[in-house]
């Protein structure tokens, strides 16, 4: 590595390792890493996976790729010997802005595991220039700005592949960029990202995300999830989705033909995993291409496509199961309309249940319905989630096709979420149980032999303290916020949505503030950390961020409370910031309304790094509890079935709880009390106050009191540090099940059957 670095620095910059700048060193390392991944053998076989997703939240790639190539430690040593720290060099990398939340991060973990297991499988998505948005806090509010991440030199490699995508009023030329995905000590796959050369980045002003949504040829791949609060925004999403699936379908068919396969046997050589409903149009688009360009009859095309496509459902929220008005499709992609109508007609001939039709009475096209009828597999992403799909949300489909439904509990790549973000913990685990866990995560169970070993438990606490100090330094440097490393670090980081209930955590912050003002000081100081972006058009979510930032300001300026309790919000939360905060956390907040979180993967990352979960009986929390035991997790709140029953009965009333419970009344009214109104925006705080009392769709007030009681117990339990550390060790030891390597092995065994 040293010799190669010297060569590249000399050739490119006429510098040496002792005279180059950090920026030059970063570019040299990137070049060497790209070269090394390019030289890896491609994972090949007679059947290939295409994982198609609107999001791939891949994070920074330099360190991740060095780890997977087996070059990380050598690189670290070389840099150290010349006075550099690799972690400082990687700070210079721009984080690719190709995803938003758990959906995109899961896709990234999956690509890592697919490559690591040596399976032939590529990702297909879009090359967003500005991503979701860059978040800035201004006047205690979220401000959205464009997030340009594509630099002159990046991980993107332009390919020769091009294709034509036909819309109603024009045709667009798709171009392809690839990012190499090296497996850990394995071969290499690719992430295919489609783009257009007519994109004009200048149509978006600085410090803004506003642009003319009708100029599709100039704006198509600028943003992930463009604001869909108007017709133009909704149509732009259809343009994006169709462009992605048409380019992807054309690439798939070309690769199959180039390999000499008969397209009538497509399902023997390709499998397409539809990640949530955004890529659903790949089904009618493949049928269109096969019938219009490859000489297939409609029957032949429908049959082979139905045997090739599989669908992953990621949500129980009806709002997230996309339904597009037929008139929009007629205005954007009229080519697909007769095919979708034909697919719906075929369902109507054999199925009497109208709720399962693809086109409903309002002339809306249900994407998930198309995926289920014309795919061979439907999977949920956690045991509880899949049961809810089968028994409630998708029951009518389960009754039709029970054999298609299966569960694949989500997982995370331990390369990024342990080896990369917590090397100190990784090395210590290695010293205790060897390095087998890097390839087989279930070997972490060997740690259970040390659960009563005081020296081991003390060392785990030391490592946690080191990570807290690193996080403290990072927050001071990036946001000017100081953190007490001796405090309990209590973290809720995830996209902002009412069902995830950041607002309930904020109500607890109000409770704690008032409690300390009343003279009840906690034994150990508490630092509550939030990190979240709210969708630009999601008003209440932005109001919740406003409330949290107002509480932060209130407490920071209160000398009575600040030494004992802090509320801090991470600005522009992303993968890089997750890698800083997760290893520092003592408590992992997973407090969604039971039955609403499909799985969650943050819960797994925190567990792996020795944080204890405070959560509801929801998503993968249930499986964490089953693995670690009731005594090593803190579960509170209504059970999933109780919540489902309440929705069905329509009897939940937050107003009743507010009026009858003095404590809840006091906490909710504090939102519009004089302390916060002196800091915040009255309209925003009043709207949130009104929402909690008048609607509270995700039943915040129902669980608030039990949440407060349970959280107080968690803080009290932290005082017995030996028992706490034992619980942390048990969580780490039992985290092996949540490796995405296990998830992918199950997908392959039961769905993909790659060869």
Language model segments and positions:
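A conserved ligand/cofactor-binding region detector
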Residues: 1-755
